[in-house]
Design a protein with these regions (language model features):
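Short proline/glycine-enriched turn/loop motifs at strand-loop junctions of beta-rich domains
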Residues: 55-61
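Short Pro-Gly-centered beta-turn/loop motif in secreted/extracellular proteins
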Residues: 83-129
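Secretory targeting and sorting signals
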Residues: 1-36
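A short, amphipathic beta-strand motif
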Residues: 48-55
């Protein structure tokens, strides 16, 4: 199934999309095409089981976060990667503008900023592959996922140990570029860090 770019839609159209897709999708468990999800999904109480496949990051702690600058911050319960994957349930409406915080086990001391997964690097289109070496060359990136209304979605991310500002750190990114929402943040050697929840622009 090909991945299509997602752009925010008018509220009424999105509401209709949420209802129609809910009736059509049933209990879909395959990897889903991300669809722009919105707060209107709250009205019908959709939930999504989000599975992240994370090789070579056993013991990494994953937290899903969502903040659009208007609604309260959403934070999932932190979950640990076991057997190369982790599954977290969250409201579908909060997948729009979702960011993923990664705390790798090799960071044994507290750091000033958290590592976030990059869904799209500048110059890459939805569906484009990007490896470690190319990711390390990038200077701008988005850590805001476009979201979904599917009941179950599986995404693949990669996490590698790197040096960041002379200290042990991590780079986390989607090896296949995913649907995203702004902003594009400045990154150093492909590493997206923040000292707070990423603010994602759903309404641009």
């Amino acid at each position: 199934m090909s991945r299509l770019p997602v752009r925010p839609l008018a509220g009424a159209l999105i509401g209709a999309l949420v209802i129609v897709m809910t009736s059509m999708l049933g209990t879909a468990t395959a990897t889903a095409v991300p669809v722009a999800a919105t707060r209107s999904a709250v009205a019908i109480e959709l939930d999504t089981d989000l599975t992240l496949l994370v090789a070579k990051c056993e013991g990494c702690v994953i937290t899903l976060l969502s903040y659009d600058g208007a609604n309260p911050v959403y934070s999932s319960v932190p979950a640990t990667v076991t057997g190369g994957s982790v599954t977290i349930n969250l409201p579908s409406a909060r997948t729009a503008g979702m960011s993923v915080r990664v705390e790798p086990p090799w960071l044994t001391t507290r750091v000033a900023a958290d590592t976030n997964v990059v869904w799209r690097y500048a110059g890459k289109a939805i569906g484009d592959s990007i490896g470690f070496r190319e990711a390390r060359s990038k200077r701008r990136a988005s850590g805001c996922w476009a979201g979904t209304v599917n009941e179950a979605v599986t995404l693949t991310i990669k996490v590698r140990q790197v040096s960041y500002r002379g200290r042990p750190g991590a780079i986390a990114w989607a090896p296949v570029t995913e649907s995203f929402v702004p902003p594009m943040e400045r990154v150093r050697d492909g590493v997206l860090v923040s000292d707070d929840v990423l603010a994602c622009d759903l309404y641009r």
